A protein has these predicted regions:
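Positively charged n-region of N-terminal signal peptides that target proteins for export
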Residues: 1-4
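Short Gly/Pro-enriched loop/turn and capping motifs at secondary-structure junctions
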Residues: 6, 103-105, 147
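Short, exposed beta-strand-loop hairpins at the edges of beta-sheets
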Residues: 141-157
Length: 168
């Protein structure tokens, strides 16, 4: 009897260790809230200045002309690098960042467009918000404590775009 209880205790302890280890690599374990540093694309975060973006990537391939936004009460323009990495500035700070092709631009956890959709849940855990459209497109949205959003779009089992929204 005593030996059976000891064996049961060892088994329970081992099972606890295995379940804890399974969650170690998962970023989003606490109420669907990421750390601010987890929300970046290619080293660019919401709030990164225009000068910092240019320091990392140089001059953009294309740039839209700044336009006034009544909703934001500031000027808005977009830098595009290549054809698939977009950084939208409100004033002098990056507010929306998006990549929509397999171009090597990654999150700090190494997730890129073209990766299997399963990588999203494996690394980030349960999303703050999830939706699936009739066409099969799935959207996984995560956020930090400041409501900065990190969104993944997937279709047919693969990530098709990754975006950051400065205020979700």
């Amino acid at each position: 009897m005593k030996q059976g209880l000891i064996l049961l205790a060892v088994f329970m302890f081992a099972l606890t260790g295995i379940s804890m280890a399974a969650g170690i690599n998962q970023i989003n374990r606490d109420g669907h809230v990421l750390n601010y540093s987890d929300i970046a694309l290619g080293g660019i975060m919401a709030g990164t200045t225009r000068a910092e973006v240019e320091e990392i990537y140089g001059a953009p391939t294309t740039r839209t002309e700044p336009e006034w936004s009544d909703a934001r009460n500031d000027m808005i323009d977009t830098y595009t690098y290549g054809t698939s990495f977009h950084v939208k500035f409100i004033g002098d700070r990056a507010e929306f960042i998006n990549t929509d092709a397999p171009n090597g631009i990654a999150t700090p956890a190494g997730v890129t467009v073209g990766d299997p959709q399963s990588k999203i849940l494996r690394i980030y855990g349960k999303p703050y918000r999830y939706s699936k459209a009739e066409n099969g497109r799935e959207t996984f949205v995560y956020r930090d404590q400041y409501h900065i959003g990190l969104a993944f779009t997937a279709q047919r089992g693969f990530i098709t775009s990754i975006g950051i929204v400065g205020s979700e």
